Amino acid sequence: MVPALRYLGSVCGRARGIFPGGFSAAHTPASGKSRLLCQGGRRASTSSFDIVIIGGGIVGLASARALILRHPALSIGVLEKEKNLAVHQTGHNSGVIHSGIYYKPESLKAKLCVQGAALIYEYCNQKGISYKQCGKLIVAVEQEEIPRLQALYERGLQNGVQGLRLIQQEDIKKKEPYCRGLMAIDCPYTGIVDYRQVAFSFAKDFQEAGGSVLTNFEVEDIEMARESPSRSKDGMKYPIVIRNTKGEEVRCQYVVTCAGLYSDRISELSGCNPNPRIVPFRGDYLVLKPEKRYLVKGNIYPVPDSRFPFLGVHFTPRMDGNIWLGPNAILAFKREGYRPFDFSARDIMDIIIKSGLIKLVFQNFSYGVNEMYKACFLSATVKHLQKFIPEITISDVLRGPAGVRAQALDRDGNLIEDFVFDGGVGDIGNRILHVRNAPSPAATSSLAISGMIADEVQQRFKL
């Protein structure tokens, strides 16, 4: 196993029914049965694969693509519990192509983000996917933030981020005329893209290479086939049985899981370690009214607090022309709870009993209260935004979309910040690779992550 590879996960997003280039997505039939979504060229239908990827978000699809391009003779399938691909984290993120400035030097996050950003730009150019390299300013608005800003600049240089420079008030105004600040880091390599479109393109590549995508397949059990080898040829070649909530089965030799918000539960289903546990954090965005979009040209971020993995409330242009403001970071009461009152008793009990959330809350009580306050009172978020663009008023913003971040947490209440691979022991454990924690910048890093996953699969499973 690659020594540095431990912590990693999946990202998901929302499909619209059509892939770029007119590649149609088949919707689930009225019966609710699982079906192939734009089946690959190898089979008209199948229930057996050499490799199965669980999870149809951007990391799962990028990994499936990388594996089939590297091993075209293998049959590879993707299982997705939703009717369409990329329904959750991929489709609810900010759409930023991160440069790699924030992350600890030599960490997987830093290495994969810098590599991944270059690969995403190259891929979008090859496929004709629209993006904007609009840059980013990380702005210090208080004197006490300047030492942290300078340290962040040095970190970016260590990580090999392209084009970084420290700028003063005069240059801040040249790039963002309505933004106030004492000093800023100019990150010209940062961009924006629609990651759903990127994910759909990965799926198109995968299926055109012969891969199959099975949607509406919510995994309920993973176990070894019970038939004896003498009685079942299928049991010999495809010893793992993956069963969904409707009792349908898929068999395979090896499994890679990229299950995002459910990565701990899928690991537990296979008899592997459920830790680190996933704690869902909801992030609510505001949207700048169209007549006020002139106030923001590119991404504007605050100087981050190194105690937390969240980057703070920021200004993010979107490919559709909107300007998103946010997000906050508050506990979600459901793993896919995009609305404030979405609730799951099971999810809440898991969070309270099985994770280190209680310790995290006590360690960061004031931060949590502040985030809850901003979520409840629009004026609190606007007041924070006014530190950067004083002209913004509460009448200039509307409540916007929300996303849920799958944050891994250990039993001591520590946030797991880096990507992690995990496996297991025994008959199933030796045939499975779990892709676990996938915090930002997993979408930016998806192509770099997929290459690492393909390397790990090849080495672990002796392909």
Swiss-Prot record:
Primary enzyme class: oxidoreductase
Keywords of this entry: Acetylation, FAD, Flavoprotein, Mitochondrion, Oxidoreductase, Transit peptide
Entry's Gene Ontology molecular function annotations: 2-hydroxyglutarate dehydrogenase activity
Residues the record lists as N6-acetyllysine modifications: 104, 173
Entry keyword annotation includes Acetylation: yes
UniProt cross-references to SUPFAM superfamilies, sorted A to Z: FAD/NAD(P)-binding domain
Alphabetized PANTHER family for the sequence: L-2-HYDROXYGLUTARATE DEHYDROGENASE, MITOCHONDRIAL
Protein name in UniProt: L-2-hydroxyglutarate dehydrogenase, mitochondrial
Gene, per the UniProt record: L2HGDH
